[in-house]
Amino acid sequence: MLRVDQTGTILIKNGTVVNDDRYFKSDVLVENGIIKEISKNIEPKEGIKVVDATDKLLLPGGIDTHTHFQLPFMGTVSVDDFDIGTQAAVAGGTTFIIDFVIPTRGQSLLEAYDQWKKWADEKVNCDYSLHVAITWWSEQVSREMEILVKERGVNSFKCFMAYKNSFMVTDQEMYHIFKRCKELGAIAQVHAENGDMVFEGQKKMLEMGITGPEGHELSRPEALEAEATNRAIVIADSVCTPVYIVHVQSIGAADVICKHRKEGVRVYGEPIAAGLGVDGSHMWNHDWRHAAAFVMGPPIRPDPRTKGVLMDYLARGDLDCVGTDNCTFCADQKAMGKDDFTKIPNGVNGVEDRMSIVWENGVNTGKLTWCQFVRATSSEAARIFNIYPRKGRIDVGCDGDIVIWDPNQSKTISKDTHHHAVDFNIFEGIKVTGIAVTTIVAGNIVWSDNKLSCVKGSGRFVPRPPFGPVFDGIEQRDKVRNELLRKVDRKPYEDDNTKNSSK
Ligand code: URP
Ligand code: ZN
Ligand code: ZN
């Protein structure tokens, strides 16, 4: 569904192309949605749209690995739907999102997938893909995972270790899900928090009379995230399959990931904009509405060092790509938990501000180079989820998803100017220098001069093939480790009587 003026053809002049391995000054020509030429002094053909990018950077469109648009969750539905959510995305320089299909316990994965895809196809303003959560385990689930991988373009499945009595799976179920992921060449993803302990912690807080939003963090401290992260990695490594920890929110969890990586375990970690941009002390704010707006799981940590340390991990490459977990609820929805924090719908914004928050806290602090920024916000996600270099790179033949980034232009983030449906912004008042001035999706300008010009439903579903680069070398690692598992040859057991009688 394209507008007539959407030709997918554009010439960008005089910009600095930044990929994750190098940057250079060049013009870029996109034709019919695909990058056609990258060279200096491309002459514009007659009638072609030309944009000047002098003193600006040309970045591969951002990839948000983790959104929940119009998610039915905790008795309500997140307010950023696939239309508003992808509008907010492109306004911030993100041109590709991966959302999560979350079937209910007992529901067919295929049925849920079809439902999510319909919701998205009708509304998306940029390309997208779907992860699928596995919330129960059976032969049927196993068969449907295969269909999703082989016929529906899914190469990632998420397990929840939290949300007891709804999405949470047991360790044994997780073991079987991971084994199936390995057979199918799909990456296993995990929401890592010890759900049983969270459940007990919640009861304890309520018994103590702590009913406000601070009870959310107090009932699910860092240690429960670190413990579950460790457990997920150990289980995945026991079946020798790559595992991706979504929304790494604490120093303890990041340390665990780093320790296992040092030992050669194939684990990936995803920090999110919230954890890199703010701290969780807001949950102690005296204004209930303000405090509740920061409630998400795992909690944004109150330890003020956290965001800087997570950024250090990202810069070192010990955390991989930045998502958002964008899952927004307005004040009246959050108020479902006004007397009991366990009923506050979990989730915050991020999809619009992710790129600027990472630039501000990463590039402007001297922690990330331009190339590392591109890696963290786009290329690495494309590699892990096996759509690179179609996405995540500016090169001939790649999709024409390009952001014209002004590293010197500033803005102050606010709910009054953001493009979300939600009535709160967790980054309110933060000044960022480094913003997307123009966003191009498939060769069409969708954001420029502070104005959106998207076409609802014009985004495409991008299938992701299995056995991506995260599986490279996995077979050999498994083989070598299995060779160490040796049976000991022994004579058959004889009890003492048999032994004596044979003497
Ligand atoms: O609080 C969160 N994270 N809400 C969305 C669901 C999830 O756990 O990712
Ligand atoms: Zn989660
Ligand atoms: Zn999530």
Curated annotation (Swiss-Prot):
Post-translational modification as stated in the protein's UniProt record: Carboxylation allows a single lysine to coordinate two zinc ions.
Annotated residues for binding of Zn(2+) 2: K158, H191, H247
EC class name: hydrolase
Signal peptide residues on this chain, from the entry's feature table: none
EC id: 3.5.2.2
Annotated positions of the N6-carboxylysine modification: K158
Residue sites binding Zn(2+) 1 per the record: H66, H68, K158, D325
Zinc keyword on record: yes
Single annotated GO MF: dihydropyrimidinase activity
Cofactor binding remark: Binds 2 Zn(2+) ions per subunit.
Function according to Swiss-Prot or TrEMBL: Catalyzes the second step of the reductive pyrimidine degradation, the reversible hydrolytic ring opening of dihydropyrimidines. Can catalyze the ring opening of 5,6-dihydrouracil to N-carbamyl-alanine and of 5,6-dihydrothymine to N-carbamyl-amino isobutyrate.
NCBIfam families, A to Z: D-hydantoinase
Stated family: Belongs to the metallo-dependent hydrolases superfamily. Hydantoinase/dihydropyrimidinase family.
Name of the protein: Dihydropyrimidinase
Name of the coding gene: pyd2
